[in-house]
């Protein structure tokens, strides 16, 4: 059977680094992401969609959000299973309780595991919900078995750890006890690929999309084949935008070109933060640089940690270790071929940094 596993959409959340207008636009894009994902799942003949919690960032939603979710999922041709997480926990009167969900959607509403049989797919799906913002009771793998179905899927929001957690500690040893075929997890915002605990495969799909500079890179979902013989799930990059956070060294370079080279290609839709470092030849105007880079990405945040470039040979010939060091390199520089001079200048900078006990 074909399984699509997603989590942590955090619909109606704030977006870091954006003004109110762009944040509203990106929130609407997040809602549209759900519709696009349903269409993608239909186009790729997904049988089951597993949504492992934190679909909403909180229960304080814009009026259209929960309805948009329900309408989108109604268009999915397969079965949908939702396991509410710590941000969107299930409670009487919550957003999950206030919407008329389509018949193809099953929401797990209890802390204790429940199993739904899918005889037409020779499968079962076992899941549980957060019913409060915290869940200190650790995961009990023995209680999470999917019965005797040839394909036993699980869906859960929580933190894989060998210690304690207020977000439902899930020990790998407990995952092993489930004897599930595949356990779809939510809570961790980075996809780490499929892991194994005994015969049970488990994975975090990561968040979709990223919402801040601590959630950089491609975001998407997992999709693939789950059979009694094995699991083949792959990450599908799907977010329209990425957060990027990079450093651009402007030493002996034009600042705008340094920024362009530091960012990943095709960053026109991305939200980018760039830390400018190195030696600047002249005073740096961030406003002017922003204007020069207008249109490079959807949003650009610049921070200046550069320092004025000094005459590297200014203390050449001084009666000191520094002066003798520079004198020797200057003589080499003057006698060098043009292609060799950049290397000598770099050696001088590294040497001065070492003598002055500072970073470059």
Task: List each language-model region with its residue ranges.
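Accessory, non-catalytic peripheral segments of nucleic-acid enzymes
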Residues: 228-360
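Short, charged, solvent-exposed linker or helix-capping segments at domain edges/interfaces
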Residues: 15, 136-139, 232-235
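His/Asp/Glu-rich metal-coordinating catalytic cores
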Residues: 48, 57-203, 207-212, 216-218, ...
């Amino acid at each position: 059977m074909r399984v699509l596993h997603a989590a942590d959409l955090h619909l109606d959340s704030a977006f870091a680094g954006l003004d109110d207008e762009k944040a509203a636009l990106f929130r609407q894009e997040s809602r549209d992401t759900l519709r696009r994902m349903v269409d993608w799942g239909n186009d790729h003949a997904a049988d089951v969609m597993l949504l492992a919690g934190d679909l909403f960032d909180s229960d304080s939603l814009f009026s259209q959000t929960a309805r948009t979710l329900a309408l989108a999922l109604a268009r999915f041709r397969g079965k949908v299973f939702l396991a509410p997480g710590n941000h969107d926990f299930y409670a009487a009167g919550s957003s999950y309780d206030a919407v008329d969900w389509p018949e193809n959607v099953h929401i797990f509403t209890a802390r204790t595991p429940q199993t739904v049989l899918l005889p037409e797919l020779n499968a079962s799906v076992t899941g549980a919900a957060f019913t409060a913002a915290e869940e200190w009771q650790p995961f009990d793998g023995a209680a999470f078995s999917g019965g005797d179905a040839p394909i036993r899927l699980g869906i859960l929001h929580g933190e894989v750890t060998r210690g304690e957690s207020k977000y439902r500690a899930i020990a790998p040893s407990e995952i092993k006890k489930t004897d599930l075929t595949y356990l779809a997890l939510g809570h961790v915002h980075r996809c780490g690929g499929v892991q194994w605990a005994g015969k049970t495969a488990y994975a975090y799909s990561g968040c979709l999309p990223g919402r801040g500079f601590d959630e950089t890179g491609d975001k998407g979902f997992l999709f693939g084949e789950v059979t009694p013989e094995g699991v083949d799930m792959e990450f599908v990059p799907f977010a329209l935008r990425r957060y990027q956070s990079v450093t651009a060294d402007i030493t002996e370079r034009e600042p705008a070109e340094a920024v362009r080279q530091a960012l990943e290609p095709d960053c026109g839709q991305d939200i980018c933060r760039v830390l400018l470092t190195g030696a600047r030849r002249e005073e740096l105007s961030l406003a002017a640089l922003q204007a020069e880079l207008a249109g490079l990405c959807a949003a650009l945040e610049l921070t200046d940690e550069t320092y004025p470039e000094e005459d590297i040979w200014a203390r050449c010939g001084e009666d000191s270790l520094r002066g003798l060091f520079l004198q020797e390199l200057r003589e080499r520089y003057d006698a060098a071929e043009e292609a060799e001079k950049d290397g000598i200048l770099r050696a001088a900078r590294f040497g001065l940094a070492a003598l002055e006990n500072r970073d470059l």
